[in-house]
């Protein structure tokens, strides 16, 4: 029994050793061999050397293609025989200038004599000399020292005075020109034109016979603020103009004839657009004269709608000319007055 166990142990050890040897041999066989270790490497190298012809090299060490042997040089080492490369910018700058095809041998200068200009002046020679003397004698004032700043109104007054003095000096130095037309005839023509214009204006529109008035007043215990009134006026296409009040024109841009206007209900009845933020009033007045330009009924309808819109925007009340609440009876009365003056 002991002999059988010994035999089995020996056979198992032999089998294990055989398996290990076979594994190492398989791994060794699967690894690729390098070209140096291969016996055929030297053979192929020798064949290549035999087939390739020897390269012909000249005295300087360059072959037929101009390729020389590889040289290893240190960094920073310079060759004294090499020529420095030319910058492309220098190549662009150095260009041969084209020679002119035609060479001018002689040059002729043409001198143009000034042409005397005729004297179209209306003044006599004596007056011209006097005017030149006045211009030469006139000198510009020189301001020395520090000048304190002036206010806008004061500066405007000073500029106006200076302009008047200059005009007066020119009028005294420049003599009277010779008249080329009949002054009396010209004055007669201008007077006749003015009379004709006045007649056409009078014929186009008669004197006002009636005035339609609407009041927009604040509620009891309140006032209308100017900061709120100004944007409302501009929204309703009113434009600040004559008599320092706002007007509604035929054109919404503020051009053409005036249809109706807005004034302050309190005396003096004017507005100051520059100080509307500090302005307050009890109410404003819409008024339209009869007869008016265009359709009177249409103009009154626009004025009534503008008054109602303004009252809605600023929380106010619309009253008639007698400061009574606006109603249907008052509306019929205004329409009757419009038809009577149409």
Swiss-Prot record:
Entries under InterPro entries matching the protein: Cell_div_ZipA, ZipA_FtsZ-bd_C, ZipA_FtsZ-bd_C_sf
The protein's role, per its UniProt record: Essential cell division protein that stabilizes the FtsZ protofilaments by cross-linking them and that serves as a cytoplasmic membrane anchor for the Z ring. Also required for the recruitment to the septal ring of downstream cell division proteins.
Cellular compartment(s): Cell inner membrane
Annotated Gene Ontology cellular component terms: cell division site; plasma membrane
Biased composition (Basic and acidic residues): 47-57
Coiled coil residues, start to end: none
Keywords assigned: Cell cycle, Cell division, Cell inner membrane, Cell membrane, Membrane, Transmembrane, Transmembrane helix
GO biological process, one term: division septum assembly
Protein name in the entry: Cell division protein ZipA
Segments for region (Disordered): 33-57
Organism: Shewanella sp. (strain W3-18-1)
Record NCBIfam families: septum_zipA
Transmembrane segments annotated in the record for this chain: 7-27
Residue numbers on the Cytoplasmic membrane side: 28-342
Gene from which this protein is expressed: zipA
């Amino acid at each position: 029994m002991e002999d059988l166990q010994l035999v089995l142990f020996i056979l198992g050890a032999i089998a294990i050793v055989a398996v290990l040897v076979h594994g190492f041999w398989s791994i060794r066989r699967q690894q690729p061999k390098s070209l140096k270790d291969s016996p055929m490497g030297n053979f192929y190298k020798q064949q290549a050397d035999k087939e390739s012809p020897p390269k012909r090299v000249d005295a300087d060490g360059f072959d037929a293609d101009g390729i020389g042997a590889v040289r290893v040089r240190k960094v920073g080492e310079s060759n004294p025989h090499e020529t420095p490369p030319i910058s492309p910018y220098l190549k662009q700058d150095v260009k041969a200038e084209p020679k002119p095809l035609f060479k001018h041998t002689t040059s002729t200068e043409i001198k143009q004599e000034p042409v005397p200009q005729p004297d179209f002046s209306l003044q006599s020679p004596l007056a011209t000399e006097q005017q030149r003397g006045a211009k030469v004698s006139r000198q510009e004032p020189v301001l020395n020292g520090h000048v304190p700043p002036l206010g806008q109104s004061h500066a405007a007054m000073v500029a106006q005075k200076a302009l008047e003095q200059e005009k007066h000096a020119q009028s005294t130095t420049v003599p009277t020109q010779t008249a080329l037309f009949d002054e009396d005839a010209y004055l007669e023509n201008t007077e006749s034109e003015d009379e004709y214009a006045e007649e056409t204006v009078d014929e186009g529109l008669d004197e006002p016979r009636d005035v339609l008035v609407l009041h927009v007043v604040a509620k009891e215990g309140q006032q209308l603020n100017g900061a709120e009134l100004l944007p409302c006026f501009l929204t309703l296409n009113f434009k600040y103009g004559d008599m320092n009040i706002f007007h509604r024109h035929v054109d919404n841009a503020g051009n053409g004839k005036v249809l109706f206007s807005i004034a302050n209900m309190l005396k003096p009845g004017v507005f100051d657009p520059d100080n509307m933020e500090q302005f307050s009033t009890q109410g404003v007045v819409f008024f339209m004269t009869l007869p008016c330009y265009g359709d009177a009924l249409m103009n009154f309808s626009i004025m009534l709608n503008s008054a109602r819109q303004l009252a809605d925007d600023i929380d106010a009340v619309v009253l008639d000319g007698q400061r009574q609440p606006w109603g249907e009876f008052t509306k019929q009365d205004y329409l009757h007055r419009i038809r009577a003056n149409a």
